[in-house]
Design a protein with these regions (language model features):
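Intrinsically disordered, low-complexity, repeat-rich polar/charged segments
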Residues: 1-22
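Bacterial extracytoplasmic/cell-wall-associated proteins, especially those involved in peptidoglycan
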Residues: 16, 21-163
Length: 163
């Protein structure tokens, strides 16, 4: 190991002769793996790809992973429907959970390679969302999110929340 160069000590300064410990290499992937990998059939997989592209097509890979994490966190929550299609198309008394299912964007998108890779990483167990179950656009002004949920992070054009 190469030791960093040390400056010459001044006459009255005492410099210990201890070796400098080597720093461990930082982790390359700062993501948390969830307990199990997800196995989706082709229809569920396509719905997940399309909603991620519709919601986060202009985001970077992490932004796309965050949206996919929210969907999969909901699937596994026991609070929301237990399928991707059920989560994505769920309607509540407040309306649709995901705007692209209402305005038709989910059916018009072309899924990018980056979106496919981001979704595959999430399906492989990566969770960069800190368990988020909700997100909203930074452009929307919904006080319900901030009053009712715990904000966990902001990335790109979205803010993410947990219960």
């Amino acid at each position: 190991a190469v030791q960093p160069a040390q400056e010459e000590p001044m006459a009255e300064e005492v410099v210990p002769e201890e070796p400098v410990p080597e720093e461990p290499a930082p982790e390359e992937v700062p993501t948390e793996a969830v307990a199990a990998n997800f196995n989706l059939d082709e229809q569920e997989y396509q719905v997940l790809l399309r909603i991620v592209e519709a919601e986060a097509g202009g985001e970077d890979t992490v932004g796309k992973m965050l949206v996919a994490n929210v969907i999969m966190n909901r699937v596994n929550s026991g609070i929301f429907p237990a399928t991707v299609t059920g989560v994505v198309y769920q309607n509540t008394e407040c309306g649709a959970q995901f705007a692209p299912t209402v305005d038709g964007r989910i059916d018009r998108v072309s899924v990018s390679q980056d979106t496919t890779e981001a979704v595959n990483r999430v399906l492989g167990g990566e969770d960069v969302s800190q368990g988020a179950l909700f997100f909203r656009s930074t452009r929307s002004r919904s006080s319900w999110f901030d009053q009712s949920l715990n904000r966990v992070l902001e990335h790109g054009n979205h803010i993410f929340y947990t219960l």
